[in-house]
UniProtKB/Swiss-Prot annotation:
GO terms for cellular component: chloroplast; ribonucleoprotein complex; ribosome. Part of the 50S ribosomal subunit. GO terms for molecular function: rRNA binding; structural constituent of ribosome. This is Large ribosomal subunit protein uL3c. It is found in: Plastid, Chloroplast. SUPFAM superfamilies: Translation proteins. PANTHER family: 50S RIBOSOMAL PROTEIN L3, LARGE RIBOSOMAL SUBUNIT PROTEIN UL3C. The lineage of its organism: Eukaryota, Viridiplantae, Streptophyta, Embryophyta, Tracheophyta. Belongs to the universal ribosomal protein uL3 family. Residues 199-211 have a biased composition (Basic residues). Residues 1-37 form a transit peptide. Keywords: Chloroplast, Plastid, Ribonucleoprotein, Ribosomal protein, RNA-binding, rRNA-binding, Transit peptide. One of the primary rRNA binding proteins, it binds directly near the 3'-end of the 23S rRNA, where it nucleates assembly of the 50S subunit. Its main location: plastid.
């Protein structure tokens, strides 16, 4: 009996499902250099508490709107991660002292392992080098920053609840007179038979606010060591009492590699 070689044009293969012809190759995790550099911080930062806004008069007489930021007990290095143990270099910082019962047992065990007081918030700062940092080290804002420096500030915006399209997306309202019954309604959300559906991402009423936002390249106007506060030019996310994350501003090519 003669056997013909099996090829992709064989009629037998056309009756097989497509998934039977696929060959599964082992996939390897590939992390590009651009994603690594994008996650790097320009330097270690601190956490702080938003206190409110006010006007600040510069020496030239210019009035500048500033946000007053205060510091509670904390900003202590709780853990140092290295490429050998964790695959990347990072400094973990704790902020805001609380009572023991406010933390879970795993959180308490993590801090007690290093002999650190109970801290409510833990955040990491991924760095190129972790030289000069040690556990239980106290981070002083005045030693890390100076007046005139640019910083990136992250925080959670004020939650507005469920809002309509006018407030949430700045839509225009409809006619208020001339027989109109749709004053603040959304209006048309798509076509008819084609495409026969509503496109994903359509701006519609929904929950507004309560999301994480980062404001970049804000100027430090004033540092007051006696009152333990700083003043940052502009508005910061959240309401008074909100947690803020302050880090050196990322400037690609200067303190962040291009690739």
């Amino acid at each position: 009996l003669k056997t013909t070689p099996l090829t992709l044009r064989s009629p037998f293969l056309h009756r097989l499902p497509l998934r039977a012809l696929k060959t599964h190759k082992p996939t390897s995790l590939h992390i590009s250099k651009s994603s690594i550099s994008a996650s790097l911080e320009a330097g270690v930062g601190v956490m702080a508490t938003k206190l409110g806004m006010m006007s600040f008069f510069e020496e030239s007489g210019t009035v500048v709107p500033v946000t007053v930021v205060g510091f509670r007990e904390g900003n202590i290095v709780t853990q140092i991660k290295t490429e050998a143990t964790d695959g990347y270099n990072a400094v973990q910082v704790g902020y805001r002292r609380v009572r023991d019962r406010k933390l879970t047992k795993p959180e308490m065990g993590h801090l007690e392992k290093s002999g650190i007081i109970p801290l409510r918030h833990l955040q990491e700062f991924r760095l190129q080098s972790i030289d000069g940092f040690e556990v239980t080290q106290k981070l002083d804002f005045g030693e890390l920053f100076k007046e005139g420096d640019l910083v990136d500030v992250s925080g959670t915006t004020i939650g507005k609840g469920f809002q309509g399209g006018i407030k949430r997306h700045n839509f225009k309202r409809g006619q208020m007179t001339h027989g109109s019954k749709s004053h603040r309604q959304l209006g048309s959300i798509g076509a008819g038979t084609t495409p026969g559906r509503v496109y994903k991402g359509k701006k519609m009423p929904g929950r507004m606010g309560g999301t994480k936002r980062k404001i970049r390249k804000l100027k430090i106007v004033k540092i007051d060591d006696q009152l333990n506060i700083i003043m940052i030019k502009g508005a910061l996310p959240g309401k008074p009492g909100n947690l803020l994350r302050i880090a050196p501003a990322k400037i690609v090519g200067k303190n962040i590699p291009k690739s």
